[in-house]
Regions:
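Surface-exposed acidic, glycine-flexible loop patches that form ligand/cofactor-binding
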Residues: 1-10, 48-55, 122-124, 171-172
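Short, hydrophobic alpha-helix immediately C-terminal to the catalytic nucleophile
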Residues: 25-29, 166
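Gly/Ser-rich "nucleophile elbow"/oxyanion-hole loop immediately N-terminal to the catalytic nucleophile
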Residues: 1-19, 29-34, 105-106
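Glycine-rich nucleophile elbow surrounding the catalytic serine of serine-hydrolase chemistry
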Residues: 17-26, 71
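The feature captures the conserved acid-bearing segment of alpha/beta-hydrolase catalytic domains
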Residues: 36-126, 137
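Soluble non-cytosolic domains of exported or imported proteins
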Residues: 29, 77-84, 155-160
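Catalytic active-site module of serine/aspartate enzymes centered on a nucleophile-bearing elbow/loop
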Residues: 153-172
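Active-site-adjacent mobile loop/cap segments within catalytic or ligand-binding domains
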Residues: 132-148
Length: 172
């Protein structure tokens, strides 16, 4: 398929929302040479995948997650690890600086009851980076979307997750 459609195999990415985010992390753990970078929105790692994750090379990772996510808890829960543990896992794998560059992003929409804090770990070994966009007060939602997933919390409108993901991927 790759040769038939002329796919640049050095620019294949994975991103996913919720269970798709879990999938992206697992793909990076199990097949790191297939992906230039991954992004996860509102999904972390299962405890089993977290324990088994020993990729053969560093992988750039973007994690976007709401602190008020009641479906996939920011702090982890039954069967899943918390966001901070996921970030620590990838910064260890990618051999990143221990201290991130932290920026509070502009609160451009004061009515969405949430803000975004960006933590960038990098540059890491092999010129990778790990980035966390912590949506303070954000729910189990895709930031920037106009479609509301009913009952799943606040949608942040200060960032557009799709744009943030492409911005992260495009130079990897």
């Amino acid at each position: 398929m790759f040769s038939q459609y002329g796919v640049d195999t050095t620019r294949v990415y994975s991103c996913g929302f919720s269970a798709g985010g879990y999938m992206s992390h697992r793909l990076a753990c199990e097949s790191p040479r297939c992906y230039a970078a991954i992004a996860s929105v509102a999904g972390t790692m299962s405890t089993a995948a977290y324990s088994a994750c020993i990729p053969s090379r560093p992988v750039p990772v973007l994690q976007i997650h709401g602190t008020a996510d009641a479906v996939v808890s920011y702090n982890g829960g039954v069967g899943g690890v918390g966001v901070d543990d996921v970030i620590t896992k990838w910064t260890t794998i990618d051999i990143c600086p221990a201290t991130p560059y932290v920026v509070q992003l502009p609160n451009t929409n004061i009515f969405d009851a949430s803000t975004v804090e960006s933590s960038l770990y990098g540059p890491c070994s092999s010129n990778t980076e790990v980035k966390l966009l912590k949506v303070v007060g954000g729910g189990h939602q895709w930031p920037g979307t106009t479609a509301l997933l009913g009952g799943l919390g606040t949608i942040n409108r200060d960032i557009n997750a799709s744009g943030e993901i492409w911005s992260f991927f495009r130079n990897k």
